[in-house]
Amino acid sequence: MGSLVVGGLVFLCLSMATSIGLIVRARLPDHHLNAESKDVIRLATAVVGTLSALALGLLIASAKSTYDNAEVEMRTAAARVLLLDRVMAQYGPETDKARQLLRELIAKRLSRGWTAETTDEPSAKALGEYQDIESVQADLRSLAPKDAAQRSLQARALEVSGMVAETHWLLVESGKEGLPWAFLTVLVCWLALLFATFGLQAPVNPTVLSILLVCALSVAGAIFLISDMANPYVGLVHVSDAPLQSAIERLGKP
């Protein structure tokens, strides 16, 4: 589910909860909303409000951690790709085919993005990324080193290629983590309860209604940002692929 859809649904839910509170207020007898009753309602909603604030804070921290980890993984992927290319370049011209395969792998990944749905999707006769990195490793294993230096470079290239494959799948797995939906559902229920009590106690006038709608929009905006950051490779707030864009410009050079 897209982040904008999530934010929109939260806004609708909170707006409906406020409306329900206003409708209930209009139908309740006056003694149900006297000063003592309102004090009890405020005390009860204070508990729910505190829990909601804690839950929202945890979601923000979780989403920010996911986003930061994705940024680190992207830079790590770019560094390992460059390292693999340079190790193969030092080996000699025998690795030209493997270097070209590596460049095609990165170009394909950049064009398809980082979602789990596109990670290994073959098109026509083209291999998916998983097969591509295996092709690079197969070329490296088929090399016939002539001396100790080339044997060392071959072993190092195979080691780094394994790290590149591992990083690729880390990027994919982190890209599909998303939000803990059960946690988010409970949070939205708490927030809806809060906004229902706001409507229950609020006088019906344009100023109060406008403020309540703005508050609902603000909370929905926060949920939208959390949802967007929890999916770091898609959406408005996404991890830049600039490190890999920069890396691909250097691949294949002598």
Report residues per predicted region.
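Structured inter-helical modules in multipass membrane proteins
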Residues: 70, 83-176
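Alpha-helical transmembrane anchor segments
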Residues: 3-29, 40, 172-254
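Short extracytoplasmic/periplasmic juxtamembrane "stem" segments immediately C-terminal to an N-terminal membrane anchor
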Residues: 73-90, 240-254
